[in-house]
Amino acid sequence: MKYNIVFKFNVEGIVDKPDVIGAIFGQTENLFGDDFDLRELQDKGRLGRISVDLSTSKGRSEGTIIIPSNLDKVETALVAAMIENVDKVGPYNAEFKLIDIVDIREEKIKKIIGRAKEILGSWSREKTLDIREVINEITSSVKTGELTEYGPERLPAGPDVDKDPELIIVEGRADVINLLRYGYKNVIAVEGATGKIPQTLVDLTKQKKAVIAFLDGDHGGDLILKELLSSNIKLDYVARAPTGKEVEELTGKEIAKSLSNMVTIAQYIKKQQEAQQAIKQALATETTTTAVTTTSTQIQVEVKPEEKKEIQITVPAQIIEEIKKLPGTLEGILLDENWNIIEKIQVRDIVQKLENISADSIRYIVFDGVITQRLVDLASAKNIKMLIGARIGGINRRPKELELLSFNDIIS
């Protein structure tokens, strides 16, 4: 069957289900010839069994009727109109009213879409081989884990942080949610630690065979790693997101690749020292060259501080309430000039949305994610006035006409 035709009916008297069904057959018989007679259509399998749900009260009868249809849309609509034309059940006046025509195939479509998502999830998850087998267990399942809170500090974590011999440390709640989406359940967040790593996390790492710090590929990730290295936490490996990217926005393939490219702490520190030494040598060479070419003439230039345009935008109370609901959802809200909600959208779709809109059509964006340089540049090009995100990443170019705020600026 393709459709369910749903009616409501009222009868000005007490009747039974067979009376209702008989009235439908009797008053529609031969209206459009034998080929479109309801009994004939049932015999041919074009219509299903008529289902009647009936109740009586105060001398009246009312209820609903469902008729399955395997006809096309035009024929199904014609059947519906025929039944609405029924005005008697037995000796009593009656009214039949169409409520809905339900497409039964929608349920099948939903099941197909659900299965397609499962297939895509297992396909997207890249399986990697690693001789250290540090990520062997966390790549064995594609089922999204349940977000939990760990310890008295209520650190966002996956369900396997206690029982798995390996542990992945990330920065924030959104990072944990993204890794859970791709099946990594032994993950825990430091929640933007500022100067002190939670003692719960310190104690947890000492119980683990291997501990991996998996951090953003920006300056914020550098700061978190510096805090981890300066604490007494047990840390064995470092993995970084691609340069300029956040862990929370990585795909399953990018996550697997980043983890497979992790290095030991000793290797990481050595690379950092080599990079710093190269910078020092470059600066020393530049200083020497400058000293040789500089003349005795000195020019003094008065440098005036850059004038910064002040932007004062008041966030309405109803939008602040919406912001309070966003943490952990990975969702965003697009708003117009008057702070009216235009659309609610997944964070991962915001950049693509902005690329396809005209300038001035969106004026404010609130979202549960990191404000990146790419998003700032795109928002500026579209004349957006304000970005409000869960966190502000490393921004090198900040347009004067665009205001950037974090959730903490709004709801702290």
UniProtKB/Swiss-Prot annotation:
One of its GO terms (cellular component) is DNA-directed RNA polymerase complex. Its cofactor is Mg(2+). Its EC number is 2.7.7.101. The keyword Oxidoreductase does not apply. Residues 165-243 form the Toprim domain. Mg(2+) 1 binds at residues 171, 216. Mg(2+) 2 binds at residues 216, 218. GO terms for biological process: DNA replication, synthesis of primer. Keywords: DNA replication, DNA-directed RNA polymerase, Exosome, Magnesium, Metal-binding, Nucleotidyltransferase, Primosome, Transcription, Transferase. Binds two Mg(2+) per subunit. It catalyses: ssDNA + n NTP = ssDNA/pppN(pN)n-1 hybrid + (n-1) diphosphate. One of its GO terms (molecular function) is poly(A) binding. The keyword Transferase applies. Belongs to the archaeal DnaG primase family. RNA polymerase that catalyzes the synthesis of short RNA molecules used as primers for DNA polymerase during DNA replication. Also part of the exosome, which is a complex involved in RNA degradation. Acts as a poly(A)-binding protein that enhances the interaction between heteromeric, adenine-rich transcripts and the exosome. Forms a ternary complex with MCM helicase and DNA. Component of the archaeal exosome complex. This is DNA primase DnaG.
